[in-house]
Amino acid sequence: MSIDAVVVRRGALLTLAALLSLFFFTTKSPAQNGPSSYTFLRKWIALDAPPGWEHRATDAIMQWTPGWQRDALGNLMRRQGSGSPRRVVACALDRPGFAVSEITDEGYLRLREVGSGRVHPLWQQFHEGQRLRILTHNGSVPAVAMVKSTHLQRNRGPAPVTTLDDLWVDVGATSKADVTRLGIQMLDPVVRESSGGWAYQGFVAGQMAGVRVGCAAVATAAGEEVSSGETIFLLTTLRSFGHDGLEAALRSLGRVDQVTLIDQSADTSATAAFSQRSVEKPAYLPESTGLNSITVLSPRVRFPGSLVESISLSDAISLLEEVEKLSGITKPKRSMVRPPWVDLPEPSAQLERADQFSNTAGILKKLADAYSVSGHEDESRAAVMEALPPWARTAARTDTHGNLVVEAGPDRDPVMFIAHLDEVGFEVTNIADDGMVSLRTRGGLYPSLWEGQRAILHFDPPFTDNSRPRKLQGVFVPRESATTKQPEAVTAWFGLDGAALKALGVVSGLAVTSDKEATRLGPTRFTARALDDRAGSTALILAARRINPSLLKRKLILAWSVREETGLEGAIAMGKRYGATVKRVFSIDTFVSSDSPLETTRFAHAPLGQGAVIRGLDNSSVAPPAELDRLLNIARSQNIPLQVGATNGGTDGSDFVRYGVLHVGLSWPGRYSHSPVEVLDLRDLQALEKLIYALAVAP
């Protein structure tokens, strides 16, 4: 049974078999099962159509669905039938967003909101610490909404809700000239990277998902024959400025008998698939139509006005049926066996660039895109193993705690380099009957950066039963309103009730994360969640690729620890094993830098792009002066750019000090720590790799 058939059977109970077929239908490719309603509706929600830039959407619609005509304001119109009655069925494509309002001398962007509309009270906050795209005349440019580093905000009082004045944008530039070279100009639209469509169990989601599904219904109905009279289908512009596009289109039509508009509703307690109401004399209804009112059709949605607004597929079908009815279509050609929706092209993928950083960026991306909340490190451990050179892969061992260890060289004067495999995230603590999943944090993070974003629940290996999913998609449930920045509790929802979740194997202790996709930022920068410590792991791998183990003069231990973010648990276990014999330990981890206009530079100031960093002082250890001088001399002798600084936080190597082991932290400067958009400079990571190699082979 296809997903559409499963969902359209309104009110039917989903058995475990139906749930599993639902999950696997949505994860298989179109070549396996054909495209699903998820696929079609996701594309409609993903359309970029900022106010004034709706052509980005209408170009695609006209290319894939012939028969539309575009007017001077960008409205699309398609007519079916003739005579009376004359009906208009309309839906607006644009949705609220941001535009570049300032480009600073340092290459940062400031924003202005564009248009109006019903958005969530935490709308601005949902963008903080998230991936963005700048829509330029030459295409999309990746960017991030900046956020204060978690490590540098300790012991500060409760923060107020984020507002537009708090939003800064980092595009990987260091000057206005850099911004210009990226093709960014004043007033360019700025959108959330993943506000476009995505799907989870029985739902599609994204910014204004309900209205976008309504637009898909209008476009689908526009391809059908009406039974009597004439129906004019409109996909309009400038909704965010009072439906100016709709008003202009209606003026061009003269007298009509009926106007139906698919739009948002202020009522969030709807019990039916959609609400239908008559609106008397709206400002955008011209007298020339001869009407005093219009009909507004509002789809039922969850989490209205947020970036994770969700509409069920069954409600989407009901909405389409009602649009057809109001359009005068009594015998639609579409079949309920296959998805009925008009198709659109897939959004263009960002091309990987080829330059002197490609190899480093490629390895880093593979590691950073792995999901491994503290205590669930299997995925990142496998990614590290795959990236190791053959000699290290052969020598690699996983201990009983999950640490990955590589030993090489003669058995004397051992030196250890240690990075960690885990990342901050969440674990399930309770599953309510209604499907709401309570979570606890794993590691130090700001829950506000996850609230109102996509959620992924990860099942733990071993995966012996191929009939069960490995991941479930859902949402981090947003508060309906707030006066403080941080939520008191974190909850996720995956589109299923508690019994269905448990039938799929959801239990307390499973990891939950947001989605992520690492990417280049500007000419030399890189952004991802979990650069702490996938960047350290990458530097260690790159150094290992340069090492010839047969030429080593002493024992070299390369280690990747587990559960660092939750108390150095893996490192403590390794300290018990190696502490009595190892002479030096170098922990490879982030130097949380204050190189950001959001931070004070009196502390932790190590600018990005100026080299690797020695963590001379942090919360857990201090570098011995003689060892610090030795490292600086080695770096100078090999022209490795190296900085020294003091920051907050602690690292794996600090636990070895109690055994009498010399410990120094080796780092790269990083911005926006423990957020979804950590940023580094690839030049610094390459300098760190060279430093690790130099120390590994030093006498």
Residue ranges and their predicted role:
Residues 6-18, 23-699:
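N-terminal hydrophobic/helix-forming segments and targeting peptides
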